[in-house]
């Protein structure tokens, strides 16, 4: 599986990156290796079109309903990482299930500089960590469906992504909290850990996006041996 960073900072090298991806995909096609290629992005037109149909009051109501749903979930289940951001999308560019005509057509479109000007396909932010979590949750399905013994996971990106949000907001990963002790406010240090229920390994997590990237990559490696 390959992930491609579809962010604005990649604009100068995106065409060359796509060409590299096409070469890798062609190799996989020749030797019949199952593969999928995704672009991760904060931009996609379907959601924007949906938003454009709503007036400001409707958008606010929808946001409040979603916020309340997560608050109720947090009350039931405690603090957890929330990766269901409206600003995270995965676009499947290539796969081993494509026909030769489909593959060649997509290749021509992607290397055309005008492709990025299509509505919904402009580059945006870098939801790197969210895309890694998606891989962590779904890589096993890909391995099982294709009866794969050894998997290679490639990420083509130029920088760090945004930090995770949690059911408690960004404060859910703060390294300290305020409590009243003997009638006085005191700052209490705290640490956060995430546990893989399959490997039973535990990882320390902070608000630092780079640390988060490293943690999820280690979780992917430990669970799937990639």
Say what each PLM segment does.
Residues 1-226:
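Acidic, glycine-rich A-domain
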């Amino acid at each position: 599986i390959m992930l491609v960073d579809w962010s604005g900072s990649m604009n100068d090298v995106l065409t060359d990156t796509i060409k590299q991806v096409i070469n890798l995909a062609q190799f996989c096609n020749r030797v019949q290796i199952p593969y999928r290629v995704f672009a991760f992005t904060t931009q996609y037109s379907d959601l924007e079109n949906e938003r454009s149909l709503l007036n400001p009051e409707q958008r606010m109501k929808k946001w409040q309903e979603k916020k309340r749903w997560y608050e109720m979930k947090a009350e039931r289940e405690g603090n957890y990482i929330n990766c269901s951001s409206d600003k995270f999308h995965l676009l499947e560019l290539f796969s081993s299930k494509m026909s030769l005509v489909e593959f060649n057509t997509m290749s021509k479109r992607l290397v055309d500089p005008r492709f990025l000007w299509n509505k919904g396909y402009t580059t945006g932010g870098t939801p790197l960590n969210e895309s890694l979590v998606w891989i962590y949750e779904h890589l096993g399905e890909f391995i099982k469906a294709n009866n794969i013994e050894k998997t290679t996971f490639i990420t083509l990106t130029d920088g760090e992504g945004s930090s995770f949000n949690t059911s408690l907001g960004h404060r859910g990963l703060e390294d300290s909290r305020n409590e009243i002790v003997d009638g006085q406010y005191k700052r209490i240090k705290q640490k956060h850990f995430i546990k893989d229920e399959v490997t039973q390994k535990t990882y320390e997590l902070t608000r630092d996006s780079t640390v988060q990237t490293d943690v999820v990559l280690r979780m992917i490696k430990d669970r799937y041996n990639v």
